[in-house]
Regions:
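Short loop/turn segments that flank or connect secondary-structure elements
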Residues: 1-235
């Protein structure tokens, strides 16, 4: 199942262009985006991909390369949950304002430099946001997958404390393209090529502008922007 309302919306990431972050107060000047608490890993493959990517990074793209090398990039909670390590109150991969290569995710910068999709280097949750796939077991034993937007509640109790969240902010819905178009690589990775092709075809038809045909009559102007056709005549 798909949340076609969100996927056909014009949402766009506002990092560095108005994003207020996910702290308890507005903090756009910190340019932390949604990276203040690190990224929780989904599985072993997620950890392996990110640690391999980190091993290729150097200080030209990664502000905290020395810290990452010496102390590692992972943290493990008491319950075994693995996440990216925090350095100076944000993700170890987050370059801060004033860094020569620019603020933002060092893994994202590396993906741009290498000419590869960011999903090949970043943690799953990071490249998927603000899209979320949730799999649930149906009573008949099948698995029902739902692809929707990531909401506050998906962050757990801490989500309620966010001063701002981008999928609730009207200013984040002014993008040039619909989400299913701007995040096509991510959706393909989450659903598979065949399913994405069906989704894209459905949404293409859903949002494609329609030509309104208005028949003109003597003494009456055709509506602006409509395509006029001659009035029907008998045969």
């Amino acid at each position: 199942m798909f949340d076609v309302t969100f996927l056909s919306s014009k949402w766009e990431c506002l990092y560095g262009r108005g994003c207020q972050g996910v702290l308890t107060g507005a903090a756009p000047e910190l340019e932390q985006g949604c990276c203040s608490y690190g990224a929780h890993f989904t599985d072993d493959a997620d950890v392996e991909r990110v640690t391999k990517a980190a091993s290729r990074l150097d200080g030209s793209l990664w502000q905290f390369a020395d810290e990452g090398r010496s102390g590692g990039v992972l943290e493990v909670d008491s319950d075994g949950t693995r996440s990216t390590r925090l350095v100076d109150d944000a993700c170890v991969f987050l370059n801060r304002p004033g860094f020569a290569a620019g603020p933002g995710c060092a893994l994202h910068l590396a993906a741009i430099a290498e000419g590869v999709p960011a999903l090949e280097l970043k943690p799953d949750v990071c490249w998927q946001l603000p899209i979320r796939r949730e799999d649930t077991d149906a009573v008949d034993g099948s698995v029902v997958s739902t692809v929707t937007q990531w909401e506050r509640k998906h962050w757990g109790k801490g989500g309620d404390e966010f001063h701002w969240w981008c999928t609730e902010a009207p200013e984040a819905f002014g993008g040039r393209n619909a989400v299913y178009q701007s995040m096509k690589d991510e959706l393909r990775a989450m659903t598979g090529d065949d399913v994405f092709a069906e989704l894209a075809a459905y949404l293409d038809a859903k949002i494609r502008p329609r030509t309104v045909v208005v028949r003109s009559t003597p003494g009456r102007a055709t509506h602006a922007g409509a395509e006029a056709t001659p009035p029907a005549t008998g045969t």
